[in-house]
């Protein structure tokens, strides 16, 4: 009977000392699917692959892969499209909600002008096109010109019957 007490005592202390997790308290990790990507672009030495839920960053200089998601800086999930601007070494991410993130020199900046606008109707961003220092967003209401240097909306062209 005495050996059972000692065994239980040592077993209990052993279980308290064993780590159950690979990450510390107060940190987060994601469990997003990284098997399906719908777009890939190149920005300098980096390749970015977009899935509907997250972004993978591949550094071509050291073969390092970084997962980018809401856990480490992106504003949302639900990526609709991405565009590279090689003249300014930046990447623009468009979400299904019409929110935008700009990645430049490892810094993620949110541009929420379209998302917060009071435009009635479809604000979805369907495609992005990069030229010079601007990225043009094709939306449900028209074309939006995004200035990469200033990290803001430069102009909006509303297309349609009344605003043609």
Regions found by a protein language model. Name each.
Residues 50-70:
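Beta-propeller domains
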Residues 53-56, 96-100, 141-144:
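Loop/turn residues immediately N-terminal
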Residues 46-49, 90-93, 134-137:
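Conserved beta-propeller blade signature
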Residues 59-63, 104-107, 147-151:
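Short loop/turn segments that connect beta-strands within beta-propeller blades
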Residues 16-20:
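Sec/Tat signal peptide C-region and signal peptidase I cleavage site
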Residues 22-43, 69-87, 112-131, 156-164:
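Short coil-to-beta transitions that initiate beta-strands within beta-rich domains
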Residues 7-15:
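Bacterial N-terminal signal peptides
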Residues 1-7:
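Bacterial N-terminal signal peptides that target proteins for export
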